Amino acid sequence: MLKIGSHVSMSGKKMLLAASEEAVSYGATTFMIYTGAPQNTRRKPIEELNIEAGRKHMEQNGIEEIIVHAPYIINVGNTTKPETFQLGVDFLRMEIERTSALGVAKQIVLHPGAHVGAGADAGIQQIIKGLNEVLTPDQTVNIALETMAGKGTECGRSFEEIAKIIDGVTYNEKLSVCFDTCHTHDAGYDIVNDFDGVLNEFDKIVGIDRLQVLHINDSKNVRGAGKDRHENIGFGHIGYKALHHIVHHPQLMHVPKILETPYVGEDKKDKKPPYKLEIEMLKNGTFDEGLLEKIKAQ
């Protein structure tokens, strides 16, 4: 079975149930959530996440595994502000606890961190320090380090940087990788013409068994732009053919694929989610040039 879905919202009273219902409405077989707002530290208690009802709905609809995304305010790469680093460590610990409580997520996707001017080596050492403070040998969820585009002072823009972080961490069996197609393309890897070559390179440097999550996004920018701006499937510089190849790649069949493509529409208050139609299009093997209009008409 193709494990494909998108980022969905966990909110209101229904929480996990709402997320599962949204995913099922898109024809998804997996999904990704934040356990609270990604831009702040306010979190509902675990008891209010409506886990049991959510899991029951997932089971009824054949969804076995979901992904959690850590909030992007976490920066364990910060060497200049001890309070930012400490917030990242404490918050990541809490996210591991919350994700474990869900019982259906094995991976927490984490942007490795930004060195904020101290240089990549210093940032990487700080990320290692943070992960060593957080990870325990008996935890049941992995931290999936996301491949980054190289915007600003981001660490993790190359497979070598990801490998360096993993190598420095004591309990690194608790680390995996989230391969983001837009980020990897924007970082300079040629996933359009030579994805198999890129995957082989990843295998040599990091190890393909570490690749446990895929973020499937097209890119608004040319390869190597270092920008990180997602585009709808087939409407960017990566293109439908390459993304379809990645989604159906025989070596990655078991890996959950998560769409983080933009909502569609000119009116900011009335943008439509693209995921149902993008998932259908990735399943059926044919690019639909009229897709954006169909999404708007939903």
UniProtKB/Swiss-Prot annotation:
Taxonomic path: Bacteria, Bacillati, Bacillota, Bacilli, Bacillales
Pfam families xrefs: AP_endonuc_2 (PF01261)
Binding site for Zn(2+) 2: E146, D180, H215, E260
Organism: Bacillus cereus (strain AH187)
S-S bonds: none
HAMAP family: Nfo
EC number(s) given by UniProt: 3.1.21.2
Name recorded for this polypeptide: Probable endonuclease 4
Alphabetized GO MF terms: deoxyribonuclease IV (phage-T4-induced) activity; DNA binding; DNA-(apurinic or apyrimidinic site) endonuclease activity; phosphoric diester hydrolase activity; zinc ion binding
Primary gene name: nfo
Cofactor binding summary note: Binds 3 Zn(2+) ions.
Sequence positions that bind Zn(2+) 3: H183, D228, H230
Residues forming coiled coils: none
Annotated keywords: DNA damage, DNA repair, Endonuclease, Hydrolase, Metal-binding, Nuclease, Zinc
Family of the protein in this entry: Belongs to the AP endonuclease 2 family.
Function: Endonuclease IV plays a role in DNA repair. It cleaves phosphodiester bonds at apurinic or apyrimidinic (AP) sites, generating a 3'-hydroxyl group and a 5'-terminal sugar phosphate.
Keyword Ribonucleoprotein: no
Keyword presence, Cell inner membrane: no
PROSITE patterns (alphabetical): AP_NUCLEASE_F2_1 (PS00729), AP_NUCLEASE_F2_2 (PS00730), AP_NUCLEASE_F2_3 (PS00731), AP_NUCLEASE_F2_4 (PS51432)
Required cofactor(s): Zn(2+)
Single biological process term from Gene Ontology: base-excision repair
Residues holding Zn(2+) 1: H69, H111, E146
NCBIfam families: nfo, PRK01060.1-1
Catalysed reactions, as listed in the record: Endonucleolytic cleavage to 5'-phosphooligonucleotide end-products
